[in-house]
């Protein structure tokens, strides 16, 4: 089973990542489907696109956009799957929705580790708009930006 232009993926565990184990107990963090923070972003590739070659292979663990597995309520209050749902817990994913595979950035994505805020008078956990490159890509490496490089970025350009 192959899609022409999309990957087919399935959730690594479940489509929502809202349970944490603390000792021998399980803590449910969220019971609703609305909050994007509790949607799983980890998936396993089941099929690669037939139209082109890619570095991502079947069986690779990928990090994807949070709306792929998301469920939502329509105007009548009926729960619906995302538009990427295919069947039997399988989803279509465009190449741009895959951010990382096997801990390597996909396409031109990079990942930045935030710096902790040491200013005791500020109520922020992390320093705004500054970080250290954790995972880079070929384009950035050609510019001399490698893992460990301290960088700044514009406000509201980051994704958590």
Annotate each predicted stretch with a short phrase.
Residues 1-160:
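Acidic-enriched and Gly/Ser
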């Amino acid at each position: 089973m192959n899609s022409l232009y999309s990957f087919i993926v399935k959730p690594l565990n479940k489509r929502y990542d809202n349970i944490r184990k603390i000792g021998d107990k399980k803590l449910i963090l969220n019971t609703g489907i609305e909050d994007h923070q509790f949607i799983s972003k980890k998936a396993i590739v089941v099929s690669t696109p037939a139209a082109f070659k890619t570095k991502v292979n079947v069986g690779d663990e990928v990090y994807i956009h949070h709306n792929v597995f998301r469920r939502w309520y329509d105007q009548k209050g009926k729960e619906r799957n995302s538009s990427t749902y295919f069947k039997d817990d399988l989803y279509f994913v465009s190449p741009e929705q895959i951010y990382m595979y096997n801990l390597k950035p996909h396409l031109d994505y990079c990942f930045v580790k935030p710096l902790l805020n040491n200013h005791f008078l500020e109520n922020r956990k992390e320093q705004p708009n500054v970080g250290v490159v954790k995972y880079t890509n070929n384009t950035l490496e050609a510019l001399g930006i490698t893992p460990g490089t301290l960088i700044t970025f514009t406000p509201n350009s980051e994704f958590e």
